[in-house]
Amino acid sequence: MRKLMIAFLALMLWPAGPALAWWDEGHMQIAYLAYKKLSPATRDRADALLKLNPDYPSWVAGAPAGQEKLYAFVHAATWPDDIKMKPDYYDDQVTDSTAKQLVPYGHLKHQYWHYKDALFSADDTPLPRPDAVDAVSQLKLMIAKLPANTDASEPLRSYSLSWSIHLVGDLHQPLHAIARYSSALPDKGGDRGGNEEQVIAANGETQNLHAYWDGIFGGYSTVFGAIFDADQRGGLSTVMPDAGKAQIIDPAVWAQESFDLAKTVAYAAPVRTDKQPVELTREYETNARDLARKQAALAAARLANLLEVVLR
């Protein structure tokens, strides 16, 4: 019943337009798993920074006693998506002078920070010059600001942490690391990471490929709901990431891995290179689900390892 209600709320409340990686449920589960791996000292340091986020009071409102830090950390994972719907936050463009600037809570949405569009041609369609500012370039800047011994102000460290928790999850969604070009989609942006291809899932819903992948874990959620789903039998808490891969904390490597997985799994048959809707096979959906779970678990482990290094 809870999953049905969440699905209904997601349908009613989620805005049309560009997909938001993993949606609330996926981002929250990743943050929850990462938080469980953090040392008490790192949890405290992260919470001290997150308290500077203007949304912190709403994050901890209603949290069970003693779980305020956990709830704040998990809520922070969706903050860069939440601001897209705030009336006092504004769009800017990747070509603007503001594109690369880290301005603490400066009321810009920076929607192009959510992905790294490595360009890929399916049929030798010419490729444009890639954007210089993306998820990888910005996450590297943010990571450099997180240690306490840098010249970054506390508000800047807080802003960087709020974004970093989210972007680690984004970069492990394969379609946030690629833009496929073809004769059917030759214009700037190509397929925009699967936003232009239409697929029909087993439930009969027609949606774009990117939204299908973003919604694998569900849509709208609460912190309680995400924790419940992660910890239930067969939930994300049971997926064990590769220990060696979990030690890799270079965003460029994560993006390259996701790019490769997009080509081999996300764009696998029966997905087309044009806008013609196609029915997904059971094999495709099973492979997508399995890969998404592995990527989310890996993202959680890497986020925890990253924060242990930069917040020690």
What are the residue ranges of the model-derived segments?
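Positively charged n-region of N-terminal signal peptides that target proteins for export
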Residues: 1-4
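Hydrophobic helical h-region of N-terminal Sec-dependent signal peptides
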Residues: 6-14
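N-terminal signal peptide c-region/cleavage motif recognized by signal peptidases
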Residues: 16-18
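N-terminal, motif-rich segments that launch catalysis or mediate targeting to/interaction with membranes
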Residues: 20-167, 174-312
